[in-house]
Amino acid sequence: MATPNNLTPTNCSWWPISALESDAAKPVETPDAPEASSPAHWPKESLVLYHWTQSFSSQKRLQVRLVIAEKGLACEERDVSLPQSEHKEPWFMRLNLGEEVPVIIHRDNIISDYDQIIDYVERTFTGEHVVALMPEAGSPQHARVLQYRELLDALPMDAYTHGCILHPELTTDSMIPKYATAEIRRHLANATTDLMKLDHEEEPQLSEPYLSKQKKLMAKILEHDDVSYLKKILGELAMVLDQIEAELEKRKLENEGQTCELWLCGCAFTLADVLLGATLHRLKFLGLSKKYWEDGSRPNLQSFFERVQRRFAFRKVLGDIHTTLLSAVIPNAFRLVKRKPPSFFGASFLMGSLGGMGYFAYWYLKKKYI
């Protein structure tokens, strides 16, 4: 069952417009910038999207939903609950042996890779009434979209997320609850001891590959806890945002005197804008926006973010995420880890709940402690 679209964001004063169902009935009218087309144009071409509606660990999952919404496609969303291990059920493994979400089905096609899903949707759904997110091949705009897709996809979003959770002193007005850092650090403090104990104890419910995965997971979180490493990658992020700021300035100079709305690669809204909007949204959530654009240092980036937030697809998809994350996922995560699971499971689970690493620990917690 898909998450309903009639939820209003809570505790998100910076989110400009709610995603109410009544509002979703009509796109925002922006001059010279057509919004997502109506799903009614594709009655027999609808997609089926299998995903976990409460998963915030991957930027690419968000991008898939935004692309579908921007193109205005009819899409039936079906929930695959990772906590209940539905991705390991035979019915889902028949769709994807890799046990990964999201997966889309269209006609007789089953696609599971993030980038392949985006490319398939863009390539397949075209026409007069459908927004094209990729410019014509061979055009300067097409080359720009490919360039910024590669650049934005390479950003280490999980490292930003873990680092900002563990070092809130580097953030301003983060949406992460203040109690999260202390609780996660409490679990991390005992994580190494717990892992050593499990190495010498028989745990029939834990296979060696699973335990190995947990060790790698903890090593990654501990690496992201290194302040010097975090400052290094945030410095590299600043250089990327400088490049994007300069690109947006070029668009202004190229189109001076024209009335079209300017985006990253030209007058048309493209896939590059979807990716940039999703990236800025995550950075805002983590408490990095005041440092990187709201301080006036990158006015073009700030203008871009304000405009992209007003788009119907972004209000619809991201409004639901705020509501679910703040009202359901985070509180439930902290209730679960209070039942005294091993510290390394508690730390990794809380990290996943706050948007970083995924839910490797949930199945074990649920089976052993609930």
From Swiss-Prot:
Disulfide bonds, paired cysteine numbers: none
Cross-referenced Pfam families: GST_C_2, GST_N_2
Organism domain of life: Eukaryota
Domain GST C-terminal: 177-344
InterPro entries in UniProt: Glutathione-S-Trfase_C-like (IPR010987), Glutathione-S-Trfase_C_sf (IPR036282), Glutathione_S-Trfase_N (IPR004045), Thioredoxin-like_sf (IPR036249)
Keyword terms, alphabetized: Coiled coil
Domain GST N-terminal: 45-129
Keyword Coiled coil tagged: yes
Annotated TM spans: none
Keyword Coiled coil: yes
PANTHER family for the chain: GANGLIOSIDE-INDUCED DIFFERENTIATION-ASSOCIATED PROTEIN 1-LIKE 1 (PTHR44188:SF2), GDAP1, ISOFORM A (PTHR44188)
Family: Belongs to the GST superfamily.
Name assigned to this protein: Ganglioside-induced differentiation-associated protein 1-like 1
